[in-house]
């Protein structure tokens, strides 16, 4: 598996059953986005109840993104048990969320990975200055790729992925917007704003477009609410 595909799988929840005993097993609690003017829950712990995480996320987003529910893609697609689907998260809003709008269901997957975890997955040292828009070897080019160096030195890269490649035959993913925020300490936020999937475990038709736009992803990833406290 190439580096690009490896990190995409990580962001999707790595559809293999993990070891049990992790931190979280998402409860299926839906909340409607109240828009960025709403006050988020005061607790920002990564182990907060799933409903509180969905509420905090919804408070950061425009009201028109739809109804938000924290889910487990492993449970949906692979029928994982709650114990098998438990995941340890680094960021207070890390998780997998369903977005329901206009009869369709899309997904947002947000994952903060530290340098060590990235290096294990990539098989090489993490480089915060790497240009992800540059084609490497035989990897496919990233469509509509935009790389932005932020004033604080972090680098945000976003691109579109048609998801038109072979994988799990039981699931067909729709197009998505992908984001990677590289931080100076070597950690990275990985995010997928997906139009959804069809096949095993589907919750509804694909959305006509990713649930969060490029600008909405940027605002979310660069805000303090997604960073661990302390």
Which residues make up each language-model segment?
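Intrinsically disordered, low-complexity prosegments and terminal tails associated
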Residues: 8-230
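Conserved small/polar residues in nucleotide/adenosyl-binding loops
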Residues: 1-5
């Amino acid at each position: 598996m190439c580096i690009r595909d490896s990190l995409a799988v990580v962001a999707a929840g790595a559809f293999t059953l993990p070891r049990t005993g992790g931190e979280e097993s998402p409860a299926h609690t839906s909340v409607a986005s109240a828009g960025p003017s709403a006050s988020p829950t005061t607790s920002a712990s990564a182990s907060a109840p799933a409903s509180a995480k969905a509420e905090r996320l919804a408070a950061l987003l425009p009201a028109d993104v739809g109804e938000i529910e924290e889910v487990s893609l492993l449970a949906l697609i692979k029928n994982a048990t709650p114990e098998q689907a438990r995941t340890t998260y680094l960021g207070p809003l890390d998780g997998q969320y369903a977005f329901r709008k206009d009869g369709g269901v899309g997904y947002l997957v947000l994952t903060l990975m530290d340098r060590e975890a990235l290096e294990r997955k990539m098989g090489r040292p993490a480089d915060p200055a790497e240009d992800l828009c540059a084609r490497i070897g035989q990897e496919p080019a990233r469509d509509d790729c935009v790389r932005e160096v932020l004033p604080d030195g972090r680098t945000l890269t976003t691109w579109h992925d048609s998801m038109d490649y072979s994988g799990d035959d039981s699931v067909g993913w729709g197009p998505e917007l992908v984001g990677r925020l590289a931080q100076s300490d070597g950690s990275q936020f990985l995010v997928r704003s997906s139009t959804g999937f069809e096949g095993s475990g589907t919750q509804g038709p694909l959305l006509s477009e990713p649930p969060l736009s490029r600008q909405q992803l940027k605002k979310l990833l660069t805000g303090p609410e997604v960073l661990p406290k302390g």
